[in-house]
């Protein structure tokens, strides 16, 4: 899933420019300036009397202020590096004796790391002349000292990306993240475990904690037992050295071999556990472009990737991978892969896009970016992949299902303190070095295995580690139940200048469709818009509501009070936009930011569904009246729901008891 600052952190901070400082192959110029003074050391007697002096700390050398003593004069040809030699003017070496600095290319030096002591030619010549003249018998002539070869080890070596280090990315960030996960003491995992069949609308209506904390649906017992075997089989097939069949044939075979699976959660469809990454490529098309994240920098890879190339990389042995990469934003709606990914029915009932965005404006004939396609993601992470701290765009909620592999989540609740720390961190230039977890409270670790599904509510901060190759499906959705948190996260995105690419697409237009949808759904309350003040006052007294209104007929019309309060937040946001659109002083003010906001607000109104500005204003006024009426009825309607639920539960128990009694009588016969 796309993340904000994600990243999601998908919207990652720009790394420091690599052109600001020259690159050295050795770790630091400080290590090359060790003094080898020729002064005679004190005698043994003196050393007993005098305290040992500490070696003075060598000052850091700013290479941008250095001058090369061997650079060719102006007009002279530039030196040509030999085979394997440093080919730029950003690799330096310092003479151990005179402390003069040289470009390696100017002196034809291949690799400065080959020497533990290196002397420039003038120093070597002078030392030879002095030694031959006999004026100094204490020291032999200077000679370069080659480093002894390192002892070879059969251990896998960490591939250090020097270019990444030069750009401000810390060394071994992958190992650092893994160490943080293993070293921290987290809060006990007390998130609720639910059965799949419990993911219903009744859960939201009767559980005050619903959509406030993450919940996990464990894998069915049969799925858990076969998961390791099936995962290994899928990876073996994908990594097999046998040549892959042609794309068209492979696609046909995959379609017949792989059958979408239904989970224990009503309405949810996921790929079968034997699906490999090559199968994904076969299904959606080998030339389909994918955005690949470089885990070390937490930013998009500069190279262009196709899903076929990604499948080859994914199944390359770990020791042969030069970089750790990740795919977290492959949306498959409108592709053949859509048949394998369907959100739970509860998610579709709550999702603003699925419920309120007109169906004819999000079908296959619509252009790719004309509507918010965020419902069906396929995520593919290799061992060691990591997504830094983020909140999904616009504070959207997430459903997340692991097909095979494992994901390790760290969660932090969206408290005022945590969100303030997150906002400050998103604006910081030291995100790569400053782990946000140090500034958050109530961190909880959750490991999600094959066949398990996680529901992440709006605003929860999280980072994700991949301990083994993993295939995941999931999606994002905005709801009526979390508008306050969603709007708060939108404000943070605006304050931290998150690029538009990493924000929830078409959010303003979607808000208009949501308002239009609720105005239509609350239309049965229109009959109360003509009540007199006296009748309205009676209606607001819950004790007399049932006598005035058939409350039972409104249980499917009037939502809970918390939802009505959130609808009012949507109303207020759209009213502010209308006020901005009709402000005549914006154009005269010369404020470019305000002018752009005014234009965006005007273009967001779906005139084909809402009408012009005057009709949009009238629609909001109508919705406001209906919401007010619904709020006056909400308590009575909720009480009616509780009674109906209690009666249904009692009837169900009675039916079950009667069934047991009948079975007992038959058994006695």
From Swiss-Prot:
It is an enzyme of class 1 (oxidoreductase). Residues 246-255 have a biased composition (Basic residues). Pfam families: Cupin_8, JHD. Substrate binds at residue 407. Keywords: Chromatin regulator, Dioxygenase, Iron, Metal-binding, Nucleus, Oxidoreductase, Transcription, Transcription regulation, Zinc, Zinc-finger. The keyword tRNA-binding does not apply. Its EC number is 1.14.11.27. PROSITE patterns: JMJC (PS51184), ZF_PHD_1 (PS01359). One of its GO terms (cellular component) is nucleus. A zinc finger (PHD-type) spans 65-126. Fe cation binds at residues 390, 392, 462. Residues 1-61, 131-150, 220-256 are annotated as: Disordered. It is found in: Nucleus. Histone demethylase that specifically demethylates 'Lys-36' of histone H3, thereby playing a central role in histone code. This is JmjC domain-containing histone demethylation protein 1.
């Amino acid at each position: 899933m796309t993340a904000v600052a994600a990243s999601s952190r998908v919207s990652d901070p720009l790394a420091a420019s690599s052109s600001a400082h020259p690159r050295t192959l050795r770790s630091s110029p400080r290590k090359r300036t060790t003094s080898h003074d020729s002064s005679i050391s004190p005698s043994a007697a003196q050393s007993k009397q005098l305290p040992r002096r500490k070696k003075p700390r060598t000052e850091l050398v700013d290479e941008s202020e250095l001058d090369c003593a061997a650079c060719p004069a102006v007009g002279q040809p530039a030196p040509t590096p030999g085979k394997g030699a440093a080919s730029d003017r950003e690799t330096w070496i310092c003479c151990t004796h005179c402390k003069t600095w040289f470009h390696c290319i100017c002196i034809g030096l291949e690799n400065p790391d080959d020497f533990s002591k290196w002397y420039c030619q003038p120093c070597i010549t002078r030392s030879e002349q002095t030694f031959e003249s006999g004026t100094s018998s204490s020291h032999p002539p200077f000679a370069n000292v080659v480093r002894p070869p390192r002892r070879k080890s059969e251990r896998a070596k960490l591939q250090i990306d020097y270019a990444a280090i030069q750009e401000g990315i810390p060394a071994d960030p992958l190992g650092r993240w893994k160490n943080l996960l293993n070293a921290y003491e987290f809060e006990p995992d007390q998130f609720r475990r639910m059965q799949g069949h419990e993911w219903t609308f009744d859960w939201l209506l009767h559980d005050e904690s619903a959509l406030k904390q993450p919940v996990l649906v464990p894998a069915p017992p049969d799925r858990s037992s076969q998961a390791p075997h099936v995962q290994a089989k899928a990876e073996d097939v994908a990594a097999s050295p046998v040549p892959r069949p042609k794309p068209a044939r492979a696609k046909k075979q995959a379609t017949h071999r792989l059958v979408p699976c239904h989970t224990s959660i009503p309405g949810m469809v996921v790929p079968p556990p034997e699906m490999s990454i090559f199968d994904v490529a076969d299904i959606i098309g080998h030339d389909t472009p994918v955005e690949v994240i470089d885990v070390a920098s937490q930013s998009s890879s500069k190279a262009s990737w196709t899903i076929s190339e990604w499948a080859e990389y994914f199944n390359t042995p770990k020791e042969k991978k030069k970089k750790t990469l990740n795919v977290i934003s492959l949306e498959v709606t409108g592709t053949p892969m859509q048949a394998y990914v369907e959100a739970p029915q509860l998610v579709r009932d709550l999702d603003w896009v699925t419920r309120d965005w007109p169906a004819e404006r999000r079908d296959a004939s619509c252009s790719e970016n004309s509507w918010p396609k965020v419902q069906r993601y396929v995520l593919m992470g290799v061992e060691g992949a990591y997504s830094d701290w983020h909140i999904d765009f616009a504070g959207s909620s997430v459903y997340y299902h692991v097909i095979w592999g494992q994901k390790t989540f760290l969660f932090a609740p969206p408290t005022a303190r945590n969100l303030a720390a997150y906002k400050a961190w998103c604006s910081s230039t030291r995100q790569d070095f400053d782990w946000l977890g140090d500034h958050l409270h109530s961190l909880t670790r959750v490991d999600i295995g094959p066949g398990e599904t996680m529901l992440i509510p709006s605003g929860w901060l999280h980072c994700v580690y991949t301990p083994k190759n993993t295939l995941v499906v999931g999606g994002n959705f905005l709801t009526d139940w979390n508008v306050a948190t969603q709007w708060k996260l939108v404000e943070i995105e605006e304050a931290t200048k998150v690029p538009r690419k990493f924000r929830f697409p078409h959010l303003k237009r979607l808000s208009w469709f949501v308002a239009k949808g609720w105005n239509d759904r609350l239309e049965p309350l229109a009959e109360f818009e003509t009540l007199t003040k006296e009748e309205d006052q009676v209606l607001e007294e819950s004790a007399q509501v049932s006598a005035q209104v058939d409350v039972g007929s409104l249980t499917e019309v009037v939502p809970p009070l918390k939802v009505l309060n959130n609808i009012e937040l949507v109303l207020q946001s759209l009213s502010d936009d209308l006020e901005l659109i009709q402000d005549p002083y914006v154009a005269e003010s010369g404020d470019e930011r305000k002018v752009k906001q005014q234009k965006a607000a005007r273009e967001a109104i779906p005139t084909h569904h809402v009408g012009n500005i005057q009709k949009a204003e009238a629609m909001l006024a109508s919705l406001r009246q209906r919401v007010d009426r619904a709020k006056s009825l909400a308590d009575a309607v909720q009480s009616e729901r509780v009674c109906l639920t209690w009666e249904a539960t009692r009837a169900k128990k009675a039916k079950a008891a009667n069934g047991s009694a009948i079975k007992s009588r038959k058994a006695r016969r």
